[in-house]
Each structure stands twice: as C-alpha cells, then as structure tokens.
Regions:
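Juxta-kinase regulatory segment immediately upstream of eukaryotic protein kinase catalytic domains
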Residues: 1-37
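ATP/Mg2+ or Mg2+-diphosphate-binding catalytic cores
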Residues: 3-5, 9-10, 208-209, 346-424
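ATP-binding glycine-rich phosphate-binding loop
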Residues: 31-55
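Active-site acidic catalytic loop and adjacent metal/ATP-binding pocket
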Residues: 47-64, 99, 227-294, 408-424
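ATP-binding pocket architecture of kinase catalytic cores
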Residues: 57-185
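A glycine-centered beta->alpha junction motif in the catalytic cores
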Residues: 70, 105, 139, 143-160, ...
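A cross-family kinase active-site recognition segment
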Residues: 157-217, 237-239, 265, 365
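Active-site activation/catalytic loop segments of kinase-like enzymes and analogous catalytic loops
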Residues: 292-326, 341-358
C-alpha cells in the first residue's frame, strides 16, 4: 500500500450513519444475544474506517460493527487474510476480536463459499453514495461484525500506568502473539505496504516534507543506517505474517484497583497505582508478510513515545518479549535501527500529511513531537549503548524469574514438609 493509497484511505472513509450500519447488519448478520440495542450504539474513533460499539438487547453480548474504507474494501485477499489471522490467534488462545459469519456465509460454509474470489464468509458489502462530482455515484464498503474484548486501551493514563512490570507484561503478551503466528500464513498478507518496516527507504520521498532541517538530517541518518546495517541481512532475517501495529491504542488491558491492604501498607502511605495487564490485541489492518523482528521493533517504538526514558521503556517491552519469543543475535543487533525506522516512517508520513492538508497542519505536526523526541533519544544514545542497556534489562528480568522460581520451589517444599509432619 503506497503513500497515495494512504491518502485515499482518508478520502474514501465511509459516508454513513450509525442507523445505516445497524440496519445493514440486521439484514445480513444474526448475532448471539439477540437484536442490537439501539440505545447502546456508540461510534468509536477510527482513522479511516467507521467503527461502532453495540450491545445486544439481552445485555449478554457486545460487538464492534466495522465499515472498511474504500481502499481496503477493494482488496478481498487482504480482508480474508485479516479474518484468517484473527481466527488463528483466537484458536491459539490469544484474545482478539473474532469475525462473525454473515447469514449467507453460515448457509454456504459447508460447500466452501467464495465471495469475490476468496474465502470471505464474514464480510458483507454495503453500497454507499459518493459526494456530488465523483466519478461514480456509489461505492461498496466491506462490513464486518467483530466480537468485543472488554477492557481499556494501553495508552498511558491515570488508570493505565506504564510501570516497568506493565511494559514487560505487554512485551510478554506480544511475544505470545509472535509465537502463535509462527504457524500462520496467508497469501493475502504478501503485499507491498508502506508501513512495512522493511520498506522504510520508500519513505525517503516523503521525508522531503519535513520542514525542520535538524529533523530532516536525523531522518536521513536513519535511512543511511538502514541501508548499511539492515539491508545486508535482509535476505536472511526470519520472515512471517505479522500484526505490524501493536501500539498502545491496539493493546487492550484489564485494570485492577489496588486492594485496601495494599494501600494501607504502602511505604509512606504513597498512592498505589492501579494494576493493568494486557488482555487483548486489536486492529489487523496493517498485517503484512515481513521480517518477524519488526513486530517487536514497532511496539518498542510506540511504547517509547512521550516517555522520560524512551530507551529504557522500550527495553522493558523487549525483555518481556524475548522471555517468550527470543530473537537471534542478528535481529537483536539490528533493533536500534529498526525501532528508529518505524519512528521515521511515522514522523515523515505525518509531515507529508501536514503538507497535503494545510488547514490541519498545526495539529498534525503537534502530534509528531513525541515521535521526534523519542527518535532523537535513541539516536543520541547510539546503537551500542541501547543494546548494552537492553541486555542488562533482560538479565534483570531473568534474575527475577530465577528468584521467583526459587521462592515457589521453597514454598512447595515447605508444604510437602508440613504434610510429612502431620502424617507422623
């Protein structure tokens, strides 16, 4: 998907109302839990799609109604790959939204129904009008119904505190995702995608829109390192289908309030933060067949944004990830450049969008500031310092795991001895 496609995704955002979508879903899907409760419908934030939260009338089920943008709707193989990945992860025990079959899909599933050339028994197409002056009077948009994962997004807030433990837990969860995806493949994910980290050199064309000379120079240094450090290993890096966008907006967490005892016994009666643990993964719009190491590089980049210690927070995510899905020595050595590559892609594309949308430029450029700050922190630290620090964080995590195992074994030994004493 090119930068032109990225722009078209925004231009081809579905033009519909919640009532339009609910009526269409009622006509094409039968939901567990009964009919949709009209009073429950809430539109959710989305960059270029339309998403609606709904609850059934009996209150037992929650869903997301998703209307895809026009660009994605014309890529049935990609839609099929997204569905297949969600079902694969669900079967592997990873909490993800699961597509609900259309009524037509349920009827024809036994004979292997095909829709528009690919398996797509969970997609229906809603015809929507286009603005006056368009080449065509209407456009078909793909509609899905997805099961809902309860929780909150992992974006940092008063309730979701990014402690080292939380970041390691996020990394461990994403390591589970990566491990589950080793056995997954779908031809629909084999595509050229601008947001595939392996294609970051294509972003060079859009980096010309970066107005600040120092930021432009910073971006060019990343492109140079990518050419000289990463590309010589391109043919030998492990490859597979990746979710490719595990940022703090796409990880779902469960927040637990601290117990009264925890608050009472807190040192100095300080405030005890709520505990958050990752419980789900959202958004499969960017899936792509790429280098497996990109999965963690992308997450490290996003969880470093807006932080006092971007390098350290990224290292905590990495330590958790490698405890579940170890990287090779080469993959680990390339991480500083790959993390920087995702940050450059985000910042350069943001600058390009601002240049194309002058009325919204101030806001778009403001949102890029955390990205530039994180990128500068990684580049100022240097590859060797980043790698040395991350290795230390991984060792500390392993030392903690050994200690916990020792404590657990000691507790088990005490229980066994107690049983022996009582048996005398």
């Amino acid at each position: 998907m090119s930068a032109e496609d990225e722009a078209r995704r925004k231009l081809e955002k579905p033009r519909c109302s919640a009532a339009d979508v609910v009526a269409f879903v009622r006509a094409n899907f039968t939901l567990d839990g009964g009919d949709i409760d009209d009073s429950s419908v809430v539109e959710l934030n989305s960059y270029d799609d339309r998403n609606y939260y709904v609850r059934t009338t009996d209150g037992s089920r929650e869903y997301t109604l998703k209307v895809h943008n026009g660009v994605e709707s014309r890529r049935p193989a990609l839609l099929a790959a997204q569905s297949a990945m969600m079902r694969h992860l669900d079967a592997a025990g990873v909490p993800v939204p699961v597509p609900v079959k259309t009524d037509a899909g349920k009827r024809l599933d036994a004979v292997g129904a095909k829709m528009r050339g690919v398996d797509a028994d969970d997609v229906a197409f809603l015809r929507l009008p286009l603005p006056d002056g368009s080449d065509q009077p209407h456009r078909d948009h793909a509609v899905r119904v997805l099961t809902w994962i309860p929780g909150e997004i992992a974006e940092r807030s008063a309730r979701v505190v990014h402690t080292p433990k939380f970041l390691r837990d996020v990394g461990g969860f994403l390591g589970d995702v990566a491990a589950a995806l080793v056995s997954f493949h779908h031809p629909g994910a084999e595509r050229w995608h601008l947001w595939d980290n392996a294609n970051v050199l294509a972003v060079r064309d859009y980096a010309e829109a970066i107005e600040d000379p120092s930021n432009r120079e910073l971006a060019e240094s990343v492109f140079h390192d990518f050419e000289t450090k990463v590309m010589p290993h391109a043919a030998t890096l492990r490859r597979g289908v990746c979710q490719n966008d595990a940022n703090d907006q796409n990880v779902v967490v469960r927040v637990t309030k601290p117990s009264l005892a925890a608050q009472f016994f807190a040192p100095g009666r300080r405030t005890v933060d709520p505990t958050a643990e990752p419980v789900g993964l959202l958004d499969f719009g960017d899936i792509v067949y790429t280098w497996r190491v990109n999965e963690i590089a992308i997450s490290m980049a996003y969880f470093a944004l807006g932080k006092d210690d971007p390098v350290g927070d990224a290292g905590e995510v990495l330590a958790g990830f490698e405890a579940t899905f170890p990287l090779t020595d080469v993959e680990r050595r390339l991480l500083p450049t790959l993390v920087a590559a995702r940050l450059v892609c985000s910042c350069a594309c943001g600058a390009y969008s601002a240049a194309m949308d002058p009325d919204n430029a101030a806001y778009l450029l403001l949102t890029q500031r955390p990205g530039w700050a994180a990128l500068r922190a990684f580049r100022d630290a240097g590859d060797d310092a980043c790698l040395e620090r991350w290795a230390g964080q991984a060792e500390r995590k392993e030392e903690t795991r050994r200690l916990l195992r020792k404590v657990k074994m000691s507790a088990q030994s005490q229980r066994i001895q107690t049983h022996v004493d009582w048996g005398r």
